[in-house]
Regions:
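Short, Lys/Arg-enriched N-terminal segments with co-localized hydrophobic residues
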Residues: 1-14
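Non-transmembrane, aqueous-exposed alpha-helical and coiled segments at domain scale
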Residues: 14-184
């Protein structure tokens, strides 16, 4: 489900406004949750061709049909779109209100696509209903010595991270005890 999209704004002696950033972030986020990369689709189609078990084939067929319907109807492939993670490469360009533009693009996508509002305040547990909040989305900014601004959006799904386990190993269990726990 991981899809990374980016947009580059090259320096052409203009101000990259908050509104430009908002609109591009909206477009990127929308595409990221609706359109799956051709390489992933091809991998699923290849898996379907070589799969021998009927139940597994049915599941792969259902996934491929879901991908097709999402693109046709313009709706997210999965109801769990997770957390939008934003990566920015900021070069020698003039940018207006970068964080605000990103947050407004995420909010617009949440309301218009629509995307399920997943984000809650870490202390109150109150849902923001717009997928933005204090330090959300996380934005990683890398300063570069180039003449462009690049924005990449990665919808980080919450599903796979729900499965975890912890064990306090006894010293007598040694490495074998650790291996046994990890392999289980």
């Amino acid at each position: 489900k991981v899809k990374i999209l980016l947009i580059k704004f090259y320096r052409v002696f203009i101000l990259i406004t908050k509104d430009i950033i908002r609109d591009k972030v909206y477009e990127l986020y929308k595409e990221a949750v609706i359109v799956l990369g051709d390489d992933v689709k091809e991998s699923l189609e290849n898996a379907l061709k070589i799969e021998e078990h009927d139940l597994a084939k049915l599941n792969i067929e259902a996934i491929l049909k879901n991908i097709e319907l999402a693109e046709q109807k313009g709706i997210p492939m999965c109801q769990d779109t997770g957390l939008p993670v934003v990566f920015v490469k900021l070069g020698n360009v003039e940018v207006e209100n970068l964080r605000q533009g990103i947050e407004e693009g995420i909010k617009k996508a949440t309301e218009e696509i629509p995307i399920r509002p997943n984000i809650v305040d870490p202390l109150s547990r109150k849902n923001t209903n717009i997928n933005v909040g204090d330090y959300i989305p996380p934005i990683d900014i890398e300063l570069i010595d180039e003449d462009y601004l690049e924005i990449t959006i990665l919808p980080k799904g919450f599903g796979s991270e729900n499965n975890n386990a912890m064990k306090m190993a006894l010293p007598a269990e040694g490495i074998e005890g650790i291996k046994e726990f990890v392999v289980i």
